[in-house]
């Protein structure tokens, strides 16, 4: 875990349409996902591990990842999924 057991959450999300247009459920997914990303230097774990850590089904986890990727909040990289602009924000 890089730089301690915390992550940055910027007040700018109040005016970010990508964030503010999320459903309450997807906002919760997004917050939990960025917490998981922090534990792995920005990269998300495999779906099976994410589902277990978040106490969700693999199906619901996959759907949430698809939704957040479509919203522009997750990027597909050659190493896996990563929150958009992770390096700039963390």
Residue ranges of model-derived segments:
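Detector for short helical micro-motifs
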Residues: 1-90
């Amino acid at each position: 875990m890089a730089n301690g057991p915390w992550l940055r959450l910027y007040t700018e999300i109040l005016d970010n349409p990508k964030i503010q247009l999320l459903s309450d459920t997807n906002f919760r997914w997004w917050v939990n996902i960025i917490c998981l990303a922090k534990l792995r230097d920005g990269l998300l774990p495999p779906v099976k591990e994410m589902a277990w850590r978040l106490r969700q089904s693999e199906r619901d986890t996959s759907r949430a990842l698809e939704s957040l990727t479509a919203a522009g909040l997750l990027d597909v990289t050659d190493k896996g999924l990563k929150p958009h602009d992770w390096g700039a924000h963390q």
